[in-house]
Amino acid sequence: MAARAGPRAALAGAAAVALLSAALVLYELPPGAVLQRAFSLHKAHSVEDMENTLQLVRNIIPPLTTKKHKGQDGRIGVVGGCQEYTGAPYFAAISAHKVGADLSHVFCTREAAPVIKSYSPELIVHPVLDSPSAVHDVEEWLPRLHALVVGPGLGRDNILLENVKGILEASKARDIPVIIDADGLWLIAQHPALIQSYQKAVLTPNHVEFNRLSEAVLSHQVDGSDHHEAVRRLSQALGNVTVVQKGERDVISDGKQVLECTQEGSSRRCGGQGDLLSGTLGVLVHWALHAAPEKTNGSSPLLLAALGACSLTRQCSLQAFQKHGRSTTTTDMIAEIGPAFSKLFET
């Protein structure tokens, strides 16, 4: 027995170190019972509590096995990419692929397709988003997709936005999870009913996008001094849609629970990090929703997926910054996905 205890103790110690920088905080909840029901926590902010929390994220990650066939671990679609913006959909799709999705699709405009194809032969690129038949063309692929990431590199062209509205409606009709970022959030601010009360939607606004959504949905900007209450209120107003407010500390809420991810990141704020997050989140949402109930221990699959995606994105940023400093780019961060994933979830 003594020989077996050593490796387990070392594993717990390594996990505790990672968890000290990836703390989870819950707000606006009755103490005790809800904490235990949601995350099996027994003593707030202890190392054991944090280990339990990250273990729930680890639990949703499917094991690698030779018994699976291509596609089972995730087929993710990214809707976005236009003449001006080709990097964002690539960042989202390749991040999903590197996290563990078997296939990544990009549905973009005809002009953007050759550019995105040139970035990587590993992505499946569909030049349909500006077509008159765009909704039908994407809808044909929906039965083969596990999650849709909407918004990276989308732009605000009226034709594209109208097509995306139809794609969102078709995705909801098929009960497909949707992660909405960037100009997808601008569209939601104009038409909140598109995702109202859709429980498989996750919004990932930054500070500016969050304020825009709050003004559209709540008719005013919420009190910025209480980020946790602000995110909770926006989620509730949207019908308990999961909201991830990106910031110095990422705040996540489904209107019932509020989580705070304090995983250490870096001070570098280059464009594209949100695309890494949204692509990662697409995969983790798929895994979380398909995990056995005992794996999540009764907690919200989407909250766990969001916490995992935020933690991984921050860890990638930290590792890239340690190597490249001020010159760090999102490409550098994407190169860290494998090592960061292993450090957080497989050690």
Swiss-Prot record:
- Segments forming a coiled coil: none
Keyword list, A-Z: Acetylation, ATP-binding, Lyase, Mitochondrion, NAD, NADP, Nucleotide-binding, Phosphoprotein, Transit peptide
Compartments annotated for it: namely: Mitochondrion
Pfam families (UniProt xref): Carb_kinase
GO BP terms: metabolite repair; nicotinamide nucleotide metabolic process
State the reactions this protein catalyses: (6S)-NADHX + ATP = ADP + phosphate + NADH + H(+); (6S)-NADPHX + ATP = ADP + phosphate + NADPH + H(+)
Per the entry, what span does the transit peptide take up?
Answer: 1-46
Q: Which residues form the YjeF C-terminal domain?
A: 53-344
Q: Does the keyword Nucleotide-binding apply?
A: yes
Listed SUPFAM superfamilies: Ribokinase-like (SSF53613)
Q: What NCBIfam families does the entry give? A: yjeF_cterm
The family classification in the record reads: Belongs to the NnrD/CARKD family.
Protein name in UniProt:
ATP-dependent (S)-NAD(P)H-hydrate dehydratase
This protein's species is Canis lupus familiaris (Dog)
